[in-house]
Amino acid sequence: MKKNFKPKAWVLPQPVLILGTYDADGTPNAMNAAWGGQWDYNKIFISLGSHATTDNLNRLGELTVAFATKDTMTEADYVGMVSGRKQPDKIERTGWKSERGENVNAPVFDCFPMTMECKVSEKLYESETGCYLIADIVNIICDEKYLAEDGKPDMEKMELITFDPIHNGYMTLGERVGDAFGSGKKLMV
């Protein structure tokens, strides 16, 4: 038997993305965003409400996008709960350290295994309450300790987390269970 539910924001899994920008005075800022994903091969999209981060993006047009992990979950949750407009020292409270990105004017926080440097290319459906942001990925930074034997990022090593919008929780992503564009070959005739 199956149960029906009214429409909800239950696309699963939802990433826990940490958006890094600089405030007008050069202070690093970050926010937690779950509504985002791949837009095209070298582009991402993020659904944003009105935040200090949105103001920073309107001013600078550049950001970093990091992937939260089991180890960064508490601080990642905090930067999603607290507004940079009301708590200007919120990054200091997390203990995160950052340096300016090599390819964008945005902070790269040292505690995340993988970070994308991005430049805003388009805003869709912009209103007083927010917008859909399309950004070009100009570089991807991965800490070498999270690389697989083939030299590419290893998701299993990262212990990435996903947002559970149904029960308001965070879950770690699981183990590899198959090969994309390979496991299904056994059903091909």
Where are the regions a protein language model picked out?
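Basic, polyanion-binding surface patches
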Residues: M1-V189
